[in-house]
Amino acid sequence: VYVMPGLGGIKFSDRHASDTAELLTKASPDYIRLRTLEIFPGTPLESLQKNGEFQEAPEEQVVKEIRTIIENTDTETEIVSDSAANLLEINGSLPGEREKMLDAIDSYLDLTGREKLEFSLHSRLNSFIGQYGGLTGDIYEKLTPFLNHNTLNISGASDNEIRSVITLIRGKLMP
C-alpha cells in the first residue's frame, strides 16, 4: 500500500494522518510505502495551490503526519521509506520496530529550525545526487557561494537561501 504524507495539506494534515493510520490498521497490508506529496507543475493540485484552495504542509508537519501514522497503526506490517521525495528514511516493522522509527522521527523534530533546514538541504542533495549522479547547473550555481574546494559550507547562508535551494531541488526530484 502506498501512503502519501502531506496529501491533506495544512488544513487536513492531522485528520489525514489519523484516518490513514485507522485505515492501515483495518487493511493490514504487508508493506506500507511512504511517498511524500510533491506538487508538480501543470497538475490540478498545482492549480488548487495557486488559487489558494490547497496549502502545502511544511516538511515538519509532514514528518509529524508520518509519526502519527507509525504511532497509531496497529497491525503487523513493514514500513518502507524509499522515495526521493521523503525527507527521512524511516524503515522498519510494526509493531516490533515502532520505537526505533519514532526515535528517528523525534530526533529530527528535536532539531532547531536552522538545523532542520540544513538537514533538509543535505537530505535533498543526497537524494538528487543519488538519483541523477550529480547536480544540474542551476543547483550548482545556487550552491557555488557556499562551496570551498567542493565542500559545502552553508553556515553563512541565510535561511531563505537554503529554502530556495531546497525548493529548486524538490522541484526536480522524481518521486
What are these regions (language model features)?
Residues 2, 17-20, 83:
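Residue-level signal for functionally critical sites in structured catalytic/ligand-binding pockets
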Residues 9-26, 88-90:
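Catalytic cores of alpha/beta
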Residues 25-33, 37-175:
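Auxiliary Fe-S-binding modules of radical SAM enzymes
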